């Protein structure tokens, strides 16, 4: 996939996330628990991915799925569910902009730390730009979020 298409997908996913969370908040407003919205979200994804796996690989795909399960392979699903829960809660309690600002800033810091940890021997000079960018993003997130906390 070329860089332009990747950028377009990332932008579409970012906008889609705002729409998704807004709709999920609406579901929680007509439900007794946030779990209804989360389960509907997961159910749609499961049906979609099961259908694609069946279409592409048939029963062999399900055999591979079962053989791929390890205890640690369940962690991304738990973290994804936590992310969805935190996002919906954030939209409900502090609004979309604050939620997005805090999530993006914390993701950038975590990603930058991971990149620094993985990049053995990278000169400090090469990290100056990314670190300054992260600081500016955190300051921007604080400016957006300070009214909510």
From Swiss-Prot:
Source organism superkingdom: Bacteria
GO cellular-component term (any): plasma membrane
Compartments reported by the entry: Cell inner membrane
Broad class of where this protein is predominantly found: membrane
Transmembrane spans: 5-25, 34-54, 71-91, 94-114, 124-144
GO biological processes: bacterial-type flagellum-dependent swarming motility; inorganic cation import across plasma membrane
Cell inner membrane keyword on record: yes
Membrane topology term: Multi-pass membrane protein
Periplasmic side: 1-4, 55-70, 115-123
InterPro entries noted in UniProt: YdcZ (IPR006750)
Topology, Cytoplasmic side: 26-33, 92-93, 145-149
Key words of the record: Cell inner membrane, Cell membrane, Membrane, Transmembrane, Transmembrane helix
Disulphide-bridged cysteine pairs: none
Name of the molecule in the record: Inner membrane protein YdcZ
Biological source species: Escherichia coli (strain K12)
